């Protein structure tokens, strides 16, 4: 059955040409086509030349978006002893020890990110089947397993986010809000591109970047010229 395309989407798609846009031009168009009745996010969809079924071709890391995400992140922390107070004082929204693990087992999921101290990971592993499918399982590589709770909480509150390539080698990531200026979105997108290049999996072969599209949550996909983005120097 063919999915019906709304009149609004048909009209928006007519504004997008079938070509790869210069990065800033693409983001200006993203902002222009964000016409939904709610605050839309800016999304990037990146196809990479990797096969994540092989461990040396997996990508999971974090990026610090210089202009932030535009949304409040609720952070939960699993710790014990003095680290509980440390996390609370640093601004964590939910803090607990074994009792928080039990609450998660019982269905508590009122947070966007879970940070754990290394000594609590054996307990956190008990709820791995619950956290894993939701992308919430703490990981040292993602910076969510650490004893330095104040720094981790500050960074994630300020706009650091975790992302990964899915099973088909595509990265789907929100890199701001459509209400941001195109220039601010460009700074965030450039930071994302730099991070993906710096964390290229050791087993990646051939052309690494296959395609890059951006869109507002309810907007049309806009192709971005990858070479132009990678060559861009925003420090000039």
Swiss-Prot record:
Superkingdom as given in the UniProt entry: Bacteria
Biological processes annotated in GO: regulation of translation; translation
One Gene Ontology molecular-function label: structural constituent of ribosome
GO annotations of cellular component type: large ribosomal subunit
CDD domains tied to this protein: Ribosomal_L1
Record's keyword terms, sorted: Repressor, Ribonucleoprotein, Ribosomal protein, RNA-binding, rRNA-binding, Translation regulation, tRNA-binding
PROSITE patterns (alphabetical): RIBOSOMAL_L1
Recorded family membership: Belongs to the universal ribosomal protein uL1 family.
Protein's job: Binds directly to 23S rRNA. The L1 stalk is quite mobile in the ribosome, and is involved in E site tRNA release.
Record's subunit section: Part of the 50S ribosomal subunit.
Name listed for the protein in its UniProt record: Large ribosomal subunit protein uL1
Organism (species): Acaryochloris marina (strain MBIC 11017)
GN (gene name): rplA
């Amino acid at each position: 059955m063919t999915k019906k395309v709304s009149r609004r989407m048909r009209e928006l798609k007519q504004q997008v040409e079938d070509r790869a846009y210069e990065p800033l031009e693409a983001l200006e168009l993203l902002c222009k086509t964000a016409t939904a009745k709610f605050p839309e996010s800016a999304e990037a969809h990146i196809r990479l030349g990797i096969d994540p079924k092989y461990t040396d071709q997996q990508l999971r890391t974090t990026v610090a978006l210089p202009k932030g995400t535009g949304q409040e992140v609720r952070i939960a922390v699993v710790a014990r002893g003095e680290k509980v107070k440390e996390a609370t004082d640093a601004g964590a929204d939910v803090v607990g020890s074994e009792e928080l693990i039990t609450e998660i087992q019982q269905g508590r999921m009122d947070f966007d990110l879970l940070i754990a101290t290394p000594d609590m990971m054996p307990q956190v592993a008990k709820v791995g089947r619950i956290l894993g499918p939701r992308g919430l399982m703490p990981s040292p590589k993602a910076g969510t397993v650490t004893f330095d709770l104040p720094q981790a909480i500050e960074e994630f509150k300020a706009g650091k986010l975790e992302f990964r390539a899915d099973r088909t080698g595509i990265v789907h990531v929100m890199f701001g809000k459509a209400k941001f200026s195109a220039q601010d979105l460009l700074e965030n997108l450039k930071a994302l591109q730099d991070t993906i290049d710096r964390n290229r999996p050791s087993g990646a072969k051939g052309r690494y970047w296959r395609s890059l599209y951006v869109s507002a949550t309810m907007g049309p996909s806009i192709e971005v010229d990858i070479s132009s983005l990678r060559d861009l120097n925003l420090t000039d």
